[in-house]
């Protein structure tokens, strides 16, 4: 059964920041289109096969199972709500961002 998805407020803000950066700093509408297409394809895959992406382990998030998917140079972090058949998109980060620092400051409940 296919899952639905929902973005947290943090994930929406992260996505806005990514798109703004791609559009204004790279001045490339092609980069924006490519990112959005990769995001769409990744979301389709996650909704069909939610457990297929890598489960991450980090000392700062041991209370929830979080998976990650790479989209260009960004990482999409999500959790699975199996009861409600929902994918929760938690955050996005740049692939070169320090994961420990990111998870230490990340509030996954918002």
Residue ranges of each PLM-predicted region?
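Basic/aromatic recognition patch in beta-strand/loop cores that engages polyanionic ligands
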Residues: 51-83
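Residue-level signal for beta-strand positions within conserved beta-sheet cores that form or flank
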Residues: 1, 65, 85-88
């Amino acid at each position: 059964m296919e899952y639905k998805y929902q973005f947290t407020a943090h994930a929406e803000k992260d996505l806005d920041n990514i798109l703004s950066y791609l559009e204004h700093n790279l001045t490339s509408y092609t980069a924006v289109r490519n990112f959005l297409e990769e995001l769409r394809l990744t979301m389709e895959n996650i909704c069909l096969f939610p457990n297929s992406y890598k489960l991450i382990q980090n000392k700062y998030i041991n209370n929830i199972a979080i998976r990650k998917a790479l989209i260009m140079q960004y990482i999409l972090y999500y959790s699975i709500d199996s009861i409600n058949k929902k994918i929760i998109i938690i955050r996005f980060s740049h692939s070169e961002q320090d994961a420990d620092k990111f998870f230490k400051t990340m509030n996954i409940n918002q």
